A protein has these predicted regions:
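Intrinsically disordered, low-complexity, mixed-charge
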Residues: 1-88
Length: 88
């Protein structure tokens, strides 16, 4: 089990980014959350098996159609045992 905190910069709000990340996380069995931030970024936490989390990080680098991702920051964190995925 691993945990990653991801901050996505670019035109990523108002394009369904959070919803597409949530669907992708649920289909991969990854727990965590995704949220729009006041500065225009999207922040997410992913917890799960390494391959599934890495797949979500890759997905975040592209996002849904309509999103323009300029930069993605990824920080390793200690897992907290999250059990579900939510949109904040």
């Amino acid at each position: 089990m691993i945990r990653r905190r991801v901050t996505v910069h670019g035109s990523v709000q108002g394009v369904g980014f959070r919803f597409s990340v949530a669907r992708a996380a649920q289909s991969r069995g990854v727990a965590g959350w995704v949220s729009n931030r006041p500065d225009g970024t999207v922040e997410a936490v992913f917890e799960g098996e390494p391959g599934a989390v890495d797949s979500l990080v890759r997905f975040s680098r592209e996002g849904p159609r309509g999103a323009v991702v300029d930069r993605v920051e990824v920080v390793e964190e200690e897992p907290e045992g999250l059990r579900s995925f939510g949109i904040r």
